[in-house]
């Protein structure tokens, strides 16, 4: 089993000669022989997928597993039922005295456990991101760090998490808390960049087709109406479930404000002064952003603590679904679980899309992705097919090691996504999951049940701020070309 098992059998004699040298070198080195601990056995079932795609799936599964473990350790119900410990899982006293010299040891559950598991996963991805910087060829020996050594990497990840549990609370929380906050906010900004780039790419692509064919114009119209309909239905449902005539003033003000934002962005998208500098600007991208604003509003409202009022001498809970009636209600976790599922799906999408765009456009992809112009319309609008050469590496097209014919694989020597960018995105995602589960700034008494049923003001305002940041980012994209034109115009 050697490198030929990974790169595939050659279809021509020239291709065999081209890669024969690389295969011989890699097979003969101890570096690749050690990789037999993982790559062949783990990826042998992925005959219909490429190695890089299988690797990406395995890393996603690792991250999902770590996140699930964090949820279990944060759940007071699970800890009490499985271990019977009302105050958390304690480290054995003998091991505690040996490691710390006293009986004051970290609790192996709760927010401290979440911080330590996420510290291990974040360090795991950050180290790989550093080691894989400026990697451009899938045949490079460094690429095996990403695609191989699965058993060793799993043991290394477990070792990092175990080592994190040996760090006392007073040394872990102060520094790692601020690192987590910064990483979490950075990941939120990354998500906002991706959603605005997604909306702009879709609009540019289909507007290009609408200028040539009426069928594309019909597609633009239907998509725009569809997104505005979803945003409108979402707003109605939010007013119905998250407001009450006798309270919930903050929810009413927030929903009204965000609806005004949606209307303002829609008007600016079709304003003549904006379209003069951006001819492709239209309601399609504004409708996508409006729909996303409604989702962020829903996420924020479902994360706030309920409001309590006194009615006829009794306390009544309002401002959450199922709790707006003047009668005792049991908190419903279904909405919170639904919101958390969407959130984690967005996390995985952001990690994968960021790594692809980083490989396609280079380190400055956050800027270049907005400037890309489509030559012809296509249904697959979110993935540009070709870009200009970057740093003398030749034209970067969509690499052919993803479900492409063998003839295309012969010509492809590029990565299908940036390995370093992929791991750095998962580094930020690990920090984002950590601070989200532990209520951001109020992590001391975080519990899974409270996080998803009772909420916290810290999480609420973080999500509201992310919604406002999305509005400002899209507003900047609309106004930046106009402001730049006025600044460059000579005075009369």
Swiss-Prot record:
Indicate yes or no for the key word Protein biosynthesis: no
Note the Pfam families from the entry.
Serinc
Q: Which domain of life is it from?
A: Eukaryota
Show the stretches that span the lipid bilayer: 58-78, 113-133, 148-168, 179-199, 217-237, 254-274, 281-301, 330-350, 421-441, 464-484
The annotated topology with respect to the bilayer is:
Multi-pass membrane protein
Q: Where in the cell is it found?
A: Membrane
Q: Name one GO biological process term.
A: phospholipid biosynthetic process
Which InterPro entries does the UniProt entry name for this protein? TDE1/TMS (IPR005016)
Q: Which PANTHER family match?
A: SERINE INCORPORATOR (PTHR10383), SERINE INCORPORATOR 4 (PTHR10383:SF5)
Protein task: Incorporates a polar amino acid serine into membranes and facilitates the synthesis of two serine-derived lipids, phosphatidylserine and sphingolipids.
Q: Which family does it belong to?
A: Belongs to the TDE1 family.
Please report the name of this protein according to its UniProt entry.
Answer: Serine incorporator 4
The scientific name of the source species is: Rattus norvegicus (Rat)
